[in-house]
Every structure is written in structure tokens, then in C-alpha cells.
Amino acid sequence: MKLIIFTGLVLFAIVSLIEAEEESGRGCILLYGECTKATGSCCSNLICDCYRKLKKGVQIARQCFCSEKDVIYKKDI
């Protein structure tokens, strides 16, 4: 019985360590990648630009994308 409990605890510890390594080893978000839920996760040469989606003047959504620093996008009509 003690062996089963010990084995279970060891397996739990190993799985926890593997998950922690995966989370800490994640790379940054690349150019034009979505950063809505993680605004600080863009690569070092990029910034997270956010845009409000409006319908009849009311905000219905917010979307963020990693874009180049010092670059301005304008709507072409």
C-alpha cells in the first residue's frame, strides 16, 4: 500500500515538473500573432497593438496583434 502511494506521488511530481518546464520554455509571439490574452508576450522587437471592434459606435470586441515597433498602419479607403 505504501509503495502504491509513494509511486503515485513520484509520478505526480514528475508530471508537475514537466508541465512547469513547458510553461517557462514557451517562446514569444511572432509578428502578426494574436496577443489579446497575453499582451506582454510579443517577441522583443515587437509590440502588442490592440484594436476595438465597433458596431454602430458600440464596442463589441477587442483584438490585439504583435506588430513591428514604430510602424503605423492606416486604413486605405
UniProtKB/Swiss-Prot annotation:
Highest taxon of the lineage: Eukaryota
InterPro entries found in the cross-reference section: Spider_toxin_CSTX_knottin (IPR019553)
Cleaved signal peptide residues: 1-20
Free-text description of this protein's post-translational modifications in UniProt: Contains 4 disulfide bonds.
Propeptide regions on this chain: 21-26
Main location: secreted
One cellular-component annotation, GO: extracellular region
Keyword annotations of the record: Disulfide bond, Secreted, Signal, Toxin
Tissue: Expressed by the venom gland.
Location of this chain's protein in the cell: Secreted
GO MF assignments: toxin activity
Family: Belongs to the neurotoxin 19 (CSTX) family. 10 (U11-Lctx) subfamily.
Identification of the protein by name: U11-lycotoxin-Ls1b
Taxonomic classification: Eukaryota, Metazoa, Ecdysozoa, Arthropoda, Chelicerata
